């Protein structure tokens, strides 16, 4: 009888390497949105990847200087605002860019101070402008910022030293400030300067 030959299974000479998984591209980080789906960044604008140091000459006066003006308006005492029983006369310091014209419309930036401060802290006064105003002037003049209006108000209530009282300032005045901002300050600003608001009603300001 013939001897059966053993069956030999062919084996590859080289063990194949595992297929490398392609590196996945990270998904773009979604910008946080507010309740209306707004990100606060225009579609054609890019957020810089790093902060830029302010050039030293920006702290000196620019050739093209914006102006500071006082805006006086009426509001009500913060703690009893809803009763509207005690009127207050307040002011905000407003920055108007170089070449401001009523024939053009401007965006408005509301810039609030912190503790132990007031409406003059950021930009100074018309008589004594602060150094930070120079920075804004240069940035606008160099095209790094579009011409815009800055409004510096204060949440100080009945005393210029209110912001130095931590309990009063951060426990009451800043919490209540939205009443004054929405009902009194913004309408005063939008009704005085050339902005994108159609009128000073809540619908017009939106």
Tell me what each language-model feature is:
Residues 1-51:
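Intrinsically disordered, low-complexity repeat and linker tracts
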Residues 31-206:
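Non-catalytic cap/lid and distal C-terminal segments of serine-dependent acyl enzymes
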């Amino acid at each position: 009888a013939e001897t059966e030959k053993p069956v030999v299974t062919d084996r590859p000479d080289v063990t194949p390497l595992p297929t490398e998984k392609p590196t996945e591209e990270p998904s773009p980080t979604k910008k946080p949105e507010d309740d209306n789906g707004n990100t606060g960044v225009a579609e054609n604008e890019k957020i810089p990847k790093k902060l830029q140091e302010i050039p030293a000459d920006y702290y000196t006066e620019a050739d093209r200087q914006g102006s500071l003006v006082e805006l006086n308006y009426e509001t009500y005492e913060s703690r009893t605002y809803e009763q509207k029983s005690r009127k207050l006369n307040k002011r905000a310091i407003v920055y108007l860019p170089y070449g401001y014209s009523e024939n053009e419309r401007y965006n408005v930036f509301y810039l609030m101070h912190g503790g132990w401060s007031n409406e003059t802290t950021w930009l100074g006064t018309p008589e004594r402008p602060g150094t930070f105003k120079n920075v804004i002037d240069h940035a606008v003049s160099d095209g790094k910022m579009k011409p815009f209006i800055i409004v510096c108000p204060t949440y100080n209530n009945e005393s210029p030293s209110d912001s130095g009282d931590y309990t009063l300032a951060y426990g009451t005045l800043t919490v209540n400030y939205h009443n004054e901002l929405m009902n009194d300050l913004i309408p005063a600003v939008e009704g005085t300067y050339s902005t994108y608001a159609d009128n000073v009603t809540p619908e017009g300001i939106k």
